[in-house]
């Protein structure tokens, strides 16, 4: 499946969507018109969650790939994450059964954000893990590489680079463990047999949205710093595709953009702190 949110005129401002959905005369189908861009898994997905305006009410729909009027554009040629599909999706009088409204008309906002919140948290975890993996790769190279008749790992400048990389990874890791623990503890207090269990889980995710934003910003920027310094430690070898840093350098960049840019996440964090006046 895929999550079709972004539009040419609605990136960070997702609620400014111009994709429209109008109920047909028979009231059996919504007719969708518009386009979504930069959609991950767009070329492969059998099921697509699409957001559109129903009389200015932001609404989520479940679209299947064989629906009339659904058109998949060409693959984007990206800087990195080349193994992932990224495509533009077109909705040209796309017929969507009324029962395929996800939730209710007008509930698209909470649905969209409750996908973004855990996505940010998971991105914080995976980028931190990537940073630690690259630190190990840079360490292996530093121990093996010799200049001036000794391992470059003995040079103070190189030691300083590793000290900074490790400190940043620990900072990111700490936020991830704290957030994971808080969410896990809150969920453990819910009754799994309660009909409202999943609504409770959703509420917990919403309540930890700020931690998720912090984890995303820290993790993605830790990975960015680490891969940049990793290239520097490896010197010319870091610029060669046969070594791990080159691919990581390209793949890393998107992490500061998707799931909400780091600038947007900083606005969310800052706004929350100023509103609540607490840490």
Predicted regions: what they are:
Residues 88-90, 115-279:
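Alpha-helical interface subdomain recognition
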Residues 92-111:
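Long, acidic (Asp/Glu-rich), low-complexity accessory segments flanking structured domains
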Residues 28-72:
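A short core secondary-structure module
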Residues 16, 68-97:
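Flexible, small-/acidic-enriched active-site or ligand-binding loops
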Residues 14-16, 43-45, 55-56, 84-86, ...:
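Short, solvent-exposed loop/turn segments at the edges of secondary structure
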Residues 9-12, 38-41, 53, 78-85:
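Short Gly/Pro-enriched turn/cap motifs at secondary-structure boundaries
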Residues 19-23:
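A structural signal for short hydrophobic beta-strand segments in well-ordered beta-sheet cores
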Residues 1-6:
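A short, Trp-centered hydrophobic/proline-enriched beta-strand micro-motif
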